Swiss-Prot record:
<dbReference type="InterPro" id="IPR043504">
    <property type="entry name" value="Peptidase_S1_PA_chymotrypsin"/>
</dbReference>
<dbReference type="InterPro" id="IPR009003">
    <property type="entry name" value="Peptidase_S1_PA"/>
</dbReference>
<protein>
    <recommendedName>
        <fullName>Uncharacterized protein MPN_586</fullName>
    </recommendedName>
</protein>
<comment type="similarity">
    <text>Belongs to the MG067/MG068/MG395 family.</text>
</comment>
<dbReference type="InterPro" id="IPR022382">
    <property type="entry name" value="Mycoplasma_peptidase_DUF31"/>
</dbReference>
<dbReference type="Pfam" id="PF01732">
    <property type="entry name" value="Mycop_pep_DUF31"/>
</dbReference>
Amino acid sequence: MRQTIYLTVNLMQNWVERWILDWANILTWKTLCHQTKIGLPNGAQAFVSAQTSTIPKTAFTAHDFVDYTLPQEQKGKEQKEQQWMKNSQTKDTDVHPYADFAVLEILLFPDSSTDRKIFNHFIQPAIRAYKQLGDSLNIFANQTLDQPKHNRYYLLGYPFLRNKAASLFLNQTEQRKEHMDKTTQILHEKPFVVLTDPAKPTLIRNKGANFTGNTWTSNYDLSKKSGLYHKFLGKKYQIYGKSIVISDLNLSSGSSGSLLLNDRKQIVGIYFGVDGPKDELGFSQLLRWQAKNNDEEKDSVAYDLIFGNKNTTKYYAQFAKEHKTHLYEQIDRSNDQQFTFVKNQKC
């Protein structure tokens, strides 16, 4: 019986069509093959990437998730002067909102040895970690903008290895064009490729001394201050919403799309970028937030990309309801209004 898995990523990677999912974990080689066959010492550890037997597909993308656009005449202004407008009649020249959040759907098949390894060594540990965090809807933080400064933060992503380790690419395929309109996926002659590039195992290693328990630095309104523009399905998009800035989170390439967790064991947002003279500040887009007063919503309204609210036109719980996922089973059992908005909505 196949397994259907949903994984969060940052939307920018999704848009540039990085459809082949790499998974990463620290594995002891004896679980895969004899170390001598791949030139590694007995008991050595490595950073492993494997390709799923089927190409992942997009389950959810956070675009057009609020009923606002940035008209062309507003787009031409200085960013601090730009004002998003309530959407009435959208023009082709208008800029639409997006958030740096997407979900991939991955099918794993038990008759595939690689899929089994992915499930056993990556998916199952992730499920166990989720259950240890509470297996609850409360795992998603829903704070007002004055609350994040009281927490410390942890990034959930690739493992941190202090020592040099090999990189193993397991069962990778290549594309070969046979005809003008046909491309086939074929296995490489070797079932694995070993590299000793030390940069791969340290994808999210901090450049500073601090690695976990980082502190809040400030709130950041992406709708007013960010110049992140993209084109998607013939439309222009600019990032929209609230972000928090975390100190000493200057992580290297590959860490974008990781979950940011606070010290209350709650998911706060998606890590997506850096800033500062030495890239010492890390940015994470909030998935949910509450406004305490109208002034906090003057640049971007309080949205909820997970459970939805009156301001959010597109959110993940709509997909969860349609496909009857584990998340929606929890929503359906809940009587807490902050989680149940989707129950009375048509999907």
